[in-house]
């Protein structure tokens, strides 16, 4: 799932080599922390958060099929 999220985010930004996704577990949930270049964060978040919302929906759907819980956070 980390690879899928990395692929999606790298496809959206101008500097894909500066994208990093880290994974951590907390309370039975996997949390993915996404970091991108300062100028690319807006592309990942989208207008009024629309793009990041859709990324979260997609990741939750994939996780649900595998019986897992996930969340996606955009880090500063």
Describe each PLM feature range.
Residues 1-43, 51-76:
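RNA-contacting regions in translation and RNA-metabolism proteins
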């Amino acid at each position: 799932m980390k690879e899928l999220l990395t692929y999606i985010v790298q496809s959206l930004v101008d500097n894909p080599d500066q994208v990093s996704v880290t994974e951590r577990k907390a309370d039975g949930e996997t949390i993915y922390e996404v970091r991108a270049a300062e100028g690319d964060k807006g592309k990942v978040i989208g207008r009024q958060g629309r793009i990041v919302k859709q990324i979260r929906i997609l990741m939750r759907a994939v996780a649900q099929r595998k019986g897992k819980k996930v969340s996606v956070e955009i880090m500063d």
